[in-house]
Design a protein with these regions (language model features):
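Single conserved hydrophobic/aromatic residue that forms the stacking wall/gate
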Residues: 1-12, 232-241
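Generic secondary-structure signature for well-ordered alpha-helical cores
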Residues: 25-29, 47-51, 60-68, 79, ...
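Structural motif
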Residues: 10-13, 17-19, 34, 41-44, ...
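A general structural motif
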Residues: 23-25, 48-55, 92, 111-116, ...
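C-terminal core of ALDH-fold dehydrogenases
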Residues: 117, 125-233
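Conserved NAD(P)+-binding/catalytic subdomain of aldehyde/semialdehyde dehydrogenases
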Residues: 6, 10-70
Length: 241
């Protein structure tokens, strides 16, 4: 039975948890999907212009999503890195969702100290995180130069939670390094393209056919070569197109 006759739509698109991802996996092929999205991911890129408490709360705010939600901080300040780790320990003592966030941070949390902004940029592009919050004295530079991510959140006011709940930008985003080759859900996912071909003159058909025939024979596709050669050799003259 076709997907339509069984009551399925043509395309399924939405964000969600592991159950949503598994449903997409089972349906993919019979219907189209937007993308396979894994556990939520967050990255904080920060320098000494921001304080450790903000970094810690933003990291743990995403770590509470589940037991396998990566949260990574990149900084060029060892002092900020140490203070952020201390703040994370403090917040986990009082966070109501600490049972989940603690496990996620323990297993998937990282603080990486880089020497330069360029190194932070390179590491961020390599990790290709789903959510990337940039809090530095050169946020726009990261916007101009980052190429691999799901969505950027620029400045300490623009935390990921606001993007989740209020701001309104797309939140079906690539995870597990998929940001290296695709973006998130966009209008193009609801469209499809078609191509068509029409050779307008006998001369063009003859020239194309001569190339096509030789290519087919070189590849060993004799059956392909037959219609190409036949059209090339037998088209009537003055044929309407």
């Amino acid at each position: 039975d076709s997907s339509t006759s069984r009551g399925l739509g043509d395309v399924y698109k939405r964000q969600g948890n592991a159950f949503v991802a598994e449903a997409k996996r089972q349906l993919f092929g019979r219907v189209g999907i937007d993308l396979f999205a894994g556990p939520t991911e967050t990255m904080v890129i920060a320098d000494e212009t921001v304080d450790a408490e903000i970094c810690a709360t933003d990291l743990l705010g995403q770590a509470e999503h589940g037991y396998n939600s990566p949260a990574v901080m990149l900084t060029n300040s060892k002092k900020l890195a140490v203070n952020t780790l201390s703040e994370i320990d403090r917040i986990l003592q009082i966070l109501p969702t600490a049972d989940t966030a603690r496990v996620s941070w323990r297993d998937y949390g990282e603080v990486i100290v880089c020497d330069t902004y360029d190194e932070m940029l390179n590491v961020a592009n390599d990790i290709a995180s789903e959510h990337v919050q940039v809090m530095t004295d050169r946020d726009d530079w990261f916007l101009e130069n980052m190429t691999c991510y799901g969505a950027l959140f620029l400045g300490p006011r623009t935390n990921v939670a606001n993007g989740d709940k209020v701001i309104g930008t797309n939140h079906t985003l690539p995870t597990k390094k998929a940001g290296r080759y695709t973006g998130g859900l966009w209008v193009g996912k609801f469209l499809k393209t078609h191509s068509y071909q029409k050779i307008l003159t006998d001369e063009a058909a003859s020239e194309i056919g001569s190339y096509g025939s030789r290519l087919c024979m070189l590849e060993g596709f004799v059956g392909h070569a037959e219609p190409v050669s036949y059209t090339h050799l037998t088209l009537p003259t003055n044929r309407e197109v």
